[in-house]
Amino acid sequence: MQSESSSIKVYFADEFKRNLRALSKKYRHIRSDIQPIVEQLQAGELPGNRIPGINDIVFKVRVKNTDIKKGKSAGYRLIYYVQMPTAIFLMSIYAKSEQVDISAEQILQIISQLNDAIIPEEIQDREGSDRPEG
């Protein structure tokens, strides 16, 4: 039996890209700091804590900021959304020192934007694969 985790795709929401670009100007190592989280997600792990009060499967992960030489609690917060077992979206990232928390409303707005955007071809192909051939 083939492992389902080998086909997990991690996508970057526009909001996440904007946040990452802004933070990378101040924190040079942010990309290498978040890489282990991306690898965990691709391996089928779901690190962090599920955010309560949201019906969708959304997690918040603490990520160490190696540029400030403090632990995870003072580092970044990475928010990701498990749209389906094979598609995970990195939705937002922020420095704990610059933003205390992200509201459920903000998260729902990002999810709404994702759902309104063009669905990646891989997802469309999988959703259409249950149609009978003929």
Model-identified regions with their sequence ranges:
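A short, surface-exposed loop/turn module that caps and links secondary-structure elements
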Residues: 42-69
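Arg/Lys-rich, positively charged N-terminal/basic patches that mediate binding to nucleic acids
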Residues: 1-36, 122-134
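Short, charge- and proline-biased low-complexity linear segments
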Residues: 31-42, 93, 98
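Enriched for short, Lys/Arg-rich terminal
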Residues: 2-4, 69, 74-134
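Alpha-helix C-capping/helix-to-loop hinge sites
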Residues: 19-26, 44, 94-97
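Short glycine-/polar-rich loops that comprise or flank the Walker A/P-loop
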Residues: 8, 56-57, 84-87
